[in-house]
């Protein structure tokens, strides 16, 4: 079956430590577990899924810029701490004009006050936080619903 859509899932700093780092906040699933789960959902929907992680802001920006060249249809991004600091990430997402959903494993509004502001939230299609790894699945389902509705 031909793939109907391309979705890029980006993960920011320290998410490579999922399952080890503060499991009471971020859960016990590893990033590989999340990638496998999303890959299975994408396959059911004939969707190409590219799942990546970097601790480097410039790498995330390079991938976002490349996404436009690769005709990516949608981005799901967990910017991690870059949500609260990176105007450059915001600018890259605005520049490519690819719709995106912001995801956070923990509820950023139950945490330190500096985490309450996201530079991406007001330009995202939506924000999902505090639902753990399921938040990624909800974001992917929302992206697929949006793409299917615009594909008609």
From Swiss-Prot:
Binding-site list for substrate: 78, 84, 91, 105-106, 115
Protein function: Catalyzes a trans-dehydration via an enolate intermediate.
SUPFAM superfamilies given in the database record: Type II 3-dehydroquinate dehydratase (SSF52304)
Quaternary data: Homododecamer.
Catalytic reaction list: 3-dehydroquinate = 3-dehydroshikimate + H2O
InterPro entries linked to this entry: DHquinase_II, DHquinase_II_CS, DHquinase_II_sf
Alphabetized Pfam families for the sequence: DHquinase_II
Active site location: 26 (proton acceptor), 104 (proton donor)
Entry protein name: 3-dehydroquinate dehydratase
Site keyed Transition state stabilizer: positions: 21
Protein family (similarity comment): Belongs to the type-II 3-dehydroquinase family.
GO MF annotation terms: 3-dehydroquinate dehydratase activity
Transmembrane regions listed in the UniProt entry: none
Superkingdom assignment: Bacteria
PROSITE patterns (alphabetical): DEHYDROQUINASE_II
Swiss-Prot/TrEMBL keywords: Amino-acid biosynthesis, Aromatic amino acid biosynthesis, Lyase
GO biological process terms held by the UniProt record: amino acid biosynthetic process; aromatic amino acid family biosynthetic process; chorismate biosynthetic process; quinate catabolic process
NCBIfam families for this protein: aroQ, PRK05395.1-1, PRK05395.1-2, PRK05395.1-3, PRK05395.1-4
CDD domains, per database record: DHQase_II (cd00466)
The EC number(s) this enzyme carries: 4.2.1.10
Pathway assigned to this chain's UniProt record: Metabolic intermediate biosynthesis; chorismate biosynthesis; chorismate from D-erythrose 4-phosphate and phosphoenolpyruvate: step 3/7
């Amino acid at each position: 079956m031909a793939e109907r859509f391309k979705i890029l899932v980006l993960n920011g700093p320290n998410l490579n430590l999922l399952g080890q780092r503060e499991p009471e906040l971020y859960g016990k699933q590893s990033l590989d577990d999340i990638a496998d789960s999303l890959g299975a959902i994408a396959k059911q929907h004939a969707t190409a899924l590219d799942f990546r992680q970097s601790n480097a802001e410039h790498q995330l920006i390079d991938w976002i810029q490349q996404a436009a060249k690769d005709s990516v249809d949608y981005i799901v991004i967990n910017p991690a701490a870059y949500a609260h600091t990176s105007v450059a990430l915001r600018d890259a997402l605005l520049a490519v004009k690819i719709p995106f959903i912001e995801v956070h494993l923990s509820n950023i509004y139950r945490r330190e006050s500096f985490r309450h502001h996201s530079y991406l939230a007001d330009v995202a299609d939506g924000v999902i936080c505090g639902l753990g790894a399921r938040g990624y699945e909800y974001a992917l389902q929302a992206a697929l619903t949006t793409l299917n509705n615009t594909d008609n």
